[in-house]
Amino acid sequence: MRTLLLTLAVALLGLVAQSSVAQPPAAQLLDAASIENQKHAQPAHYLVVSAGEGLAPQATFYRQVEMAGPFESLGDEQMAMLAEGLTGRQGHGALVRLRDDQGQVVYQAVVKIPRWLRSETLLPEDHPRSKGRDTRIDAHVQRLHEATFAIRVPVIEGASNLEISYGPAELRTANTFDLDDLARQYFGAEDTVSQSLTGATFEAVPGFTSGSSNNRVDILFLAEGYTSSDLRWFRVDTDTFAQRFMSTLPFSAYRSHFNFWRLHVPSLGRGADRPLCPDPDDENLDNGTYVNTAFDATYCTGGIWRLLTVDSAKALQAASEYPNWDIIITVVQSTLRGGSGGEVAVTSMDDGYTVSDDILGVVQHEFAHTFANLGDEYVDENADYDPCSDLNTDPSDNCEPNVTDVYYRSGLKWKHWVSSSTPVPTTSPLSDPLAAGSWEGARYLDDGMYRQCFNGIMRDSLEPFCRVDRERVLVSMYLGGWGVPGGGVSTIEPGTRSPSAASLTLSEGQSVTLSARTFAPSPGPNLTVEWYVNNARVRTSSVAPGNTSSYTFTAPLAGTTWTVRMKAIDNNSLLHSSTRPQVAKSATWTIQVSGGGCPFCLQGD
């Protein structure tokens, strides 16, 4: 049995084949995502940035790349919402603003950055630390005092002033970069990247791409500790992992919303470094051995035996080959189980042909931390983690979406999922093991903190996602803040609106048919599509996923301005009915009515 380590690098990534990277077979080049990405490609700036608590961001790498467009700048309200959402305990964010020569903001986004390096592994049932505890998860949590992350912004003529602010509001630092200067400073960087990727192979994971990276969650598998002769094994491992990852809810219901890619970067040696480790749990397996790998994978990070990490700066630079990434999973070929979650999350995989439930559960548990901001629900009073409270008015003190110190029904963040017949607090398991209530014992404390589910994946990684967990993953997918695009996945496919112009001019009495194509899981329930004129709803219809909705607007009196908006609502039952409108997306047209003489004018693009 080949045991292999999977380094789930949730620091976000993607890939596009360049001249130095071996091309996949012709058939794989024709997958839907690659076709759409090439069709809508546009130039972008790609930076790797380092920052620390109280230390201003510094650019350590720059490259101009091609990305799937169009880029959509976040509005001020959405920026504020995402920034507030990133002040929680799991992470904070970098606020990114690109300005033109007049100082006007022409593009802005939020980048989510983890605050913690986690080691959460599943102990054997007979392990001494498993006895007398409500979980087999063995947790070690370390604060990240420095962060490395990627910034991607579109190339816009006349806009070279990039401002990056980092950290929680009370400690936020900022720096401004001249992108033209960075381009000159890093001239030749592409040659350096190409040399580091000599012999690399990039391809889509067969059967796991569905559309443009501009409107999907793009997961990149990055090979570490695989030699040039190990490409076959890397394919087997990642094929199986993608299949297993997408086989459980909520992912299985939203398979069309994810793309999987892989980049095999050959290493000279197999596995990862195993330094001598002071951890008393160290089993001294091949300790003191070192191997030459592409991303410097090593065990015993921070003195914790199974804490496996890679050089995130090197990984992010390599990922510039496909800059559409949202999540990186670095697969480390090793016989020793280990892992971490943070800027780069790591977990082990027993066998590339099967992927054990233990490994799958830990990977999805870490994904839930980083992608959906979910908190741990198990008790471990040795965990060194910041306290939280939903009783305070300061949002930076609030707890994660699935845990709380609120003990009464009306104050529960997940009260919409709690049946009126369920007592709060809840003391016994419910007949439906995934149903919501309020059980005491959560977020490492056995009293004073409450969890939303009796026993789900955030309490025991062998358990499924509960209803609140599932919804939070989908809410995060739709609201964004985790990659590119920063605004999340849309229920309206980008690039399908007609007319494509955001601003139109019509003559009095003229008509125009407005339309766009919907996007939701298929098979699945129809979407509810609402049309608004100046914020007054004028039509509601039921539209099958992937179908187009249209509305014909007739221009009234000359000299007036009208706003027409299409709103598409995902009706999947994994989203509570009260949540669905909150994550719906819209397409908007502004129409000016002239006094005549303009048969049909389009302004903008």
Task: State each model region's role.
Residues A200-R216, L222-T227, D239, Q243-A383:
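Active-site-proximal segment of zinc-dependent metalloprotease catalytic domains
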Residues G158-S160, A558-V564:
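Exposed beta-strand face motif in extracellular beta-rich ectodomains
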Residues T7-V16:
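Bacterial N-terminal signal peptides
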Residues P24-T198:
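Extracellular glycoprotein-like low-complexity segments
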Residues L171-E203, H576-L602:
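Short beta-strand elements
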Residues S19-A22:
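Boundary at the C-terminal end of the N-terminal hydrophobic targeting segment
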Residues F149-I151, N547-Y551:
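Short strand-edge motifs at loop-to-beta-strand transitions and within beta-strands
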